[in-house]
Regions:
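Charge-rich, low-complexity N-terminal segments
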Residues: 1-62
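Phosphate/ribose-recognition catalytic cores of enzymes acting on nucleotide-derived substrates
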Residues: 57-99, 107-112
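Conserved, surface-exposed functional patches that form binding/active-site neighborhoods
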Residues: 90-137, 295-296
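Short His-Asn-centered micro-motif
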Residues: 91-94, 189, 229-232, 286-288
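Short, solvent-exposed loop/turn segments at secondary-structure junctions
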Residues: 96, 194-195, 233-235, 289-292, ...
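Cysteine/selenocysteine-centered motifs that mediate thiol-based redox chemistry or coordinate metal-sulfur cofactors
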Residues: 150-180
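Alpha-helical substrate-recognition element adjacent to the catalytic core
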Residues: 182-264
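C-terminal cap/substrate-recognition subdomain and adjoining C-terminal extension
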Residues: 240-339
Length: 339
């Protein structure tokens, strides 16, 4: 069996896009939900459906909603187009659900899959892999028959009334997005040594073009809020230039950490901001650590990306920042259900 993380990093590379997961307990659904928001990327298509023909499955503006119902043996992923309609479903027969060390949901794939489209296509995939697993002794006869039975249940439950399937997926997507809107991804941003190489003899610092491109890519890719922690936030000519830079790159959700004599370090300022905004749970700190290395607060330090002040913000810093932003809140790191 293969472990599949719902950040979809194994095959699709979605770990560098916004990812959310949560429990849903409502009349129509009980279980886990996960959302991948695709904020960039060229479109990818599946073109093997008899009725639907060529359908988009990934690309800028799309999103994937994955639902794992309690007590069942499958994971259903609805691939939503930018207009809010579903292009296709990919449903995995699964063995178990687990949570990785970074808190991200995953499942153990039991090979057999079902694919659906709104045009009425129903495709059963990878049965030969299931057969091979049975012949090799990986699965017992009971496990093999259970996988086949679950595949048929998937067709009966999700494939018979595709309109109803799309409606419930849309309803769950709306629910998930409402929760996501209350959980902003946040970038605490230093300026000197991050977006520029500080030159003390210069009245106005010059933004490094590559660093500017990198911070804009991070903010747009992760749909993140910016909270400036630099002393430049106190105002002045350079601050006005920074605001113009962000505005010119369509970045408008900008805030600053509190300041005053009562704060003795950036650590205290960031903690004060987090206290004022308890809905912020997922955040990253981009800092060259010239003023504060955050050693007095190990929790904050876990969210730190140390930026080399002689280079400014680099691509590898952005990659690490995405990984930190997609960490999930600590929960039991065990199998949730073994089915």
């Amino acid at each position: 069996m293969t472990k599949k993380r719902l950040t979809r990093d194994l095959k699709w590379g979605f770990q560098y896009f916004p990812y959310y997961q949560m429990r849903i307990e409502c009349e129509k659904f009980h279980g886990w939900a996960a959302l991948n928001e695709l904020t960039d990327g060229e479109y990818m298509y599946w073109d093997f459906f008899e009725k639907a023909g060529r359908v988009p499955v990934a690309g800028k503006g799309m999103c994937w909603l994955t639902l794992i119902p309690d007590g069942r043996k499958h994971s259903i992923t609805a691939m939503f187009m930018e207009d809010g309609n579903v292009s296709a479903w990919y449903i995995d027969v699964i063995h178990s659900v687990l949570i990785d060390e970074d808190g991200v949901l995953a499942f153990m794939d039991k090979y057999l899959d079902v694919m659906l489209t709104t045009s009425g296509d129903v495709l059963v995939e990878d049965k030969e892999e299931l057969d091979a697993a049975y012949r090799s002794g990986e699965f017992t006869e009971e496990q093999y028959e259970a996988a086949l039975l679950e595949g048929q249940r998937i067709i009966d439950e999700w494939g018979k009334d595709i309109h109803a399937t799309e409606l419930i997926c849309k309803e769950m997507l709306n629910y998930v997005k409402a929760q996501v809107n209350n959980q902003p991804l946040t970038v605490f941003l230093d300026i000197d040594g991050v977006l520029n190489i500080y030159q003390p003899d210069s009245e106005v610092q010059t933004l490094l073009p590559c660093a500017g491109e990198n911070i804009c890519e991070l903010i747009h890719r992760m749909k993140a809020k910016v909270v400036v922690i630099s002393s430049h936030r106190l105002g002045g000519r350079y601050w006005d230039m920074l605001l113009d830079f962000f505005k010119g790159n369509h970045i408008y959700d900008i805030d600053i950490t509190p300041y005053g004599e009562e704060y003795h370090s950036r650590t205290e300022e960031i903690n004060a901001y987090l206290h004022m905004h308890p809905n912020i749970e997922r955040y990253v700190i981009l800092d060259d650590c010239f003023q504060d290395d955050y050693s007095c607060d190990l929790k904050l330090r876990e969210h730190l990306v140390f930026v080399d002040a002689l280079k400014g913000l680099q691509k590898q810093d952005i990659i690490k920042a995405c990984e930190i932003l997609n960490r999930q809140a600590p929960v039991c790191r065990a199998v949730i259900h073994d089915v």
